[in-house]
Amino acid sequence: MEGVAMKLPSFPNAISIGHRSFSRVRCSSSLSVCSAAAASSATISTDSESVSLGHRVRKDFRILHQEVNGSKLVYLDSAATSQKPAAVLDALQNYYEFYNSNVHRGIHYLSAKATDEFELARKKVARFINASDSREIVFTRNATEAINLVAYSWGLSNLKPGDEVILTVAEHHSCIVPWQIVSQKTGAVLKFVTLNEDEVPDINKLRELISPKTKLVAVHHVSNVLASSLPIEEIVVWAHDVGAKVLVDACQSVPHMVVDVQKLNADFLVASSHKMCGPTGIGFLYGKSDLLHSMPPFLGGGEMISDVFLDHSTYAEPPSRFEAGTPAIGEAIALGAAVDYLSGIGMPKIHEYEVEIGKYLYEKLSSLPDVRIYGPRPSESVHRGALCSFNVEGLHPTDLATFLDQQHGVAIRSGHHCAQPLHRYLGVNASARASLYFYNTKDDVDAFIVALADTVSFFNSFK
């Protein structure tokens, strides 16, 4: 992580720096947003927001009902990982308490029960993204492993010197580094799409880059920094016109909106459980059936074989071919519970609510002086994801995030968000990021804005 401007302790009400002592003030009169946000929060508590989706579901998330550093927890880091509802935690505990056993290996009751629930989770994931067959879902350790699976299994087998892989400068490291490794091994060339004036990947340039040399387009669906989304259906058409495949990093879209893989028509799509109310340690790869059948194994070991001889082995059909060894059984079952939970609320409802609260976050944050938000401005035609990456002039984002946590119990992300090339392109080393999920409320946003104003006021007092 980037260097920190100063290491902040747990601050008392009066702080001494050098030979001067300063008293902390929660809100500076120079930042009128404090009183405005506080008034807004009071109105929200008694108005229609009191029955918002965020308020209705918060009871399901035990972790949100606690104090951190003497303040009520305000969790605004769901783009890094989401919190887990009780139903998911209970599903994980029930597996270990009542039918813990290995899958696909035993005929006894516990093994049969575990196998049934494990495969049921696969079917739930397939239905959730509208895959035509559950065998198109490969369970992986996370989305990073899913991308590496495609890179090593499909990429090493299909790319040759001079072939081109198109990405954008806004990709997560997980969608850059594997293709760097594969390009070094195969001689393939990586082509990067830069941003346009709205700070979104330039789709016109992407289309211009696609040529008969293009073998793969690997792009995000929603950016974890810019909050922008890409027109995947159009990109797929352009790529398929020249015989290229498309891999979609859907980690920031599957948890937040309806994702239909048959409608998108992408060849591969990856997502991660822990960003969609599920546990860590499991993600999934969607791959078109014919492609998965054409790909060699990624890892060797138990379960992925058909027959093993001393001089050779034959391999199982997908998805087993790509799931060597004992899988994350309880985690897969809990992911299935997360899918049930999200489906019970309804992804259209979740997306609609997040568009509203995400716009509210953008408007409140942009009203603060000296704040620079990255990515496009929201409009009738541009719906940002419910996150804002930003910087405050003169403040290091890590100092800012530390103060918010220690003094206000507000949890946000600071750093490069696994997107160093993008930050370099934007001309900064790091940014702060506040990211929302459907369990957040406008009250959370207001608390964050008040806390941020106090943070800026505190640091400005030393200038």
Swiss-Prot record:
Q: Which cofactor does it need?
A: pyridoxal 5'-phosphate
> What reaction is this protein's catalytic activity?
(sulfur carrier)-H + L-cysteine = (sulfur carrier)-SH + L-alanine; L-selenocysteine + AH2 = hydrogenselenide + L-alanine + A + H(+)
User: Known activity regulation?
Assistant: The cysteine desulfurase activity is stimulated over 40-fold upon complex formation with SUFE1.
Location in the cell reads: Plastid, Chloroplast; Plastid, Chloroplast stroma
**UniProt modified residues of type N6-(pyridoxal phosphate)lysine:** K275
Instruction: Provide the biotechnology use note.
Output: NFS2-overexpressing transgenic plants have enhanced ability to tolerate and accumulate Se and may be used in phytoremediation.
- Primary localization class, coarse: plastid
What are the alphabetically sorted keywords of the record? Answer: Chloroplast, Lyase, Plastid, Pyridoxal phosphate, Transferase, Transit peptide
Q: Name one GO cellular component term.
A: chloroplast
Q: What does this protein do?
A: Catalyzes the removal of elemental sulfur and selenium atoms from L-cysteine, L-cystine, L-selenocysteine, and L-selenocystine to produce L-alanine. Supplies the inorganic sulfur for iron-sulfur (Fe-S) clusters. Required for the maturation of all plastidic Fe-S proteins and, thus, essential for plant growth.
Q: What does the record note on quaternary structure?
A: Heterotetramer with SUFE1. Interacts with QS. Interacts with SUFE1.
What name has this protein been given in UniProt? Cysteine desulfurase 1, chloroplastic
Tell me the classification of the organism that encodes this protein: Eukaryota, Viridiplantae, Streptophyta, Embryophyta, Tracheophyta
